[in-house]
């Protein structure tokens, strides 16, 4: 097997100062059997349950500085982890809406927190009329999520993605994977010290809006919660963020009988965004649907391309939570930004089929095939997906580019070796960073499966 070493430089906001602890906002709870759940079909781990003072949290967050205009924060918030402990984070408001939309819906907020107790942890969370939802990324443990589990939005469960059982019917991504028109070149490093911001238009069906209460504000709150998490992964892996356009609420439909969507979601979304928003006014478009579990990006790498950039959709019977956000939405938008499927159970001829079985990263099919190696996708992209997306967006011009000032780290995976099958081995790598940032590493298989390594043999032989 061939391996490449992927070095990940976490985006770090420096010179943050300490403020008082606001841990009293969260209190451990034993209310596990008396809950009135948001949706009885949602099955979440409930070993660690907390009560949240939501109004107190809102008040505590009022002083959080805006991330894009400040490098310092005295706002410190505690967030419970899956071990039942409270972890402190230095918090910035991190709106994923353009200013006009954010001003129209001031109760819908997004934030990012930089770990104090664990400096390698980054929390992405949203606060809205739908409550509190979070995702904490850390290189030394499984991604952790917080979800409301009571209808009054006072009780929350904290869990690791690795501990969650998949209660969904299989998800089908029906996008047709195509090889890149020109060969993908190996780059020295995917990072070029540029943050790329794309204007995002998200539409929804009437059924989706009804699921969250039936108003545009509630639909937007749900979209904001999902995209806060998706943005967290895209920022961490691609240095890409998406911002909902100022008039995004024009394409939020609350009546299933009159919305412009039937079943031809790809073409109907593209037509809707072209006519209602205008091709010059967004960079990538997506549709959220409450229906059967499936999705289709409409194209590969078509962000910024008029006539096709607004043709992706994600559909689920339960269009909320980490499975919807990470396994489904991030997967389909990943296609739109240029990533192909990474599983090896089937060889699609793109050069990306590198992961054993159905895969374990976002562009795989974790948990939904007969060649599964795990139940759900890990909340990150495979090294080849990162290469595909970053190569693609570096050739785009529709986005806004912002220099990060972050020095590009270097990684050394050592010499290449060929060893017999089933031989034990140990991998040793190294890296350097001119800024002195702590680097994290991830070893991944980096050769695409041959025709004899697909199907039932993919998990065992890859």
Task: Name each region found by the language model.
Residues 245-267, 305-380, 453:
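The catalytic-center signature of Zn2+-dependent metalloproteases
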Residues 1-24:
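Bacterial Sec-dependent N-terminal signal peptides
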Residues 21-26, 30-36, 154-301:
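Fold-level signature of zinc-dependent metallopeptidase catalytic domains
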């Amino acid at each position: 097997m061939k391996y490449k070493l992927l070095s990940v430089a976490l985006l770090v906001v420096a010179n943050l100062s300490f403020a008082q602890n606001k841990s009293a906002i969260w209190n451990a709870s034993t209310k596990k059997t008396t809950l009135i759940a948001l949706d009885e079909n949602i099955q979440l781990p409930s070993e660690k349950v907390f009560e949240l003072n939501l109004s107190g949290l809102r008040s505590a967050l009022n002083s959080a500085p805006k991330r894009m205009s400040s490098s310092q924060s005295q706002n410190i918030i505690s967030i419970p982890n899956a071990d039942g402990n409270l972890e402190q984070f230095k918090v910035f408001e991190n709106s994923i809406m353009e200013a006009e939309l954010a001003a129209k819906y001031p109760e819908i907020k997004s934030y990012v927190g930089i770990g104090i107790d664990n400096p390698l942890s980054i929390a992405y969370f949203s606060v809205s009329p739908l409550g509190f939802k979070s995702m904490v990324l850390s290189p030394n443990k499984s991604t952790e999520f917080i979800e409301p589990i009571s209808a009054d939005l006072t009780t929350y469960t904290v869990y690791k993605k690795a501990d969650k059982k998949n209660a969904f019917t299989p998800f089908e991504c029906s996008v047709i994977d195509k090889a890149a028109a020109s060969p993908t070149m190996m780059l020295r490093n995917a990072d070029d010290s540029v943050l790329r911001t794309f204007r995002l238009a998200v539409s929804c069906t009437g059924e989706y809006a009804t699921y969250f209460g039936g108003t545009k504000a509630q639909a937007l709150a749900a979209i904001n919660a999902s995209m806060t998490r998706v943005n967290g992964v895209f920022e961490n892996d691609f240095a890409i963020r998406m911002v909902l356009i100022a008039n995004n609420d024009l394409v939020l439909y609350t009546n299933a009988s009159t919305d412009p969507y039937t079943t031809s979601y790809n073409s109907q979304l593209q037509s809707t965004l072209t006519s209602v928003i205008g091709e010059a006014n967004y960079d990538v478009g997506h549709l959220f649907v409450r229906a059967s579990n499936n999705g289709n990006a409409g194209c590969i790498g078509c962000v910024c391309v008029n006539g096709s950039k607004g043709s992706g959709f994600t559909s689920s019977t339960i269009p909320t939570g980490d499975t919807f956000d990470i396994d489904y939405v991030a997967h389909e938008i990943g296609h739109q930004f240029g990533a192909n499927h990474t599983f090896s159970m089937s060889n699609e001829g793109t050069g990306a089929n590198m992961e054993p079985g159905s895969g374990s990263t976002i562009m795989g099919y974790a948990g939904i095939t007969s060649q599964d190696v795990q139940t759900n996708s890990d909340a990150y992209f495979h090294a080849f997906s990162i290469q595909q997306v970053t190569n693609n967006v570096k050739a785009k011009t529709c986005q806004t580019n912002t220099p990060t000032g972050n020095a590009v780290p270097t990684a050394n995976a050592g010499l290449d070796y060929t060893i017999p099958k089933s031989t034990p081995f140990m991998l040793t790598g190294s890296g350097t960073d001119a800024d002195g940032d702590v680097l994290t590493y991830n070893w991944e298989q980096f050769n695409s499966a041959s025709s004899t390594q697909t199907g039932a043999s993919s998990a065992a032989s890859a």
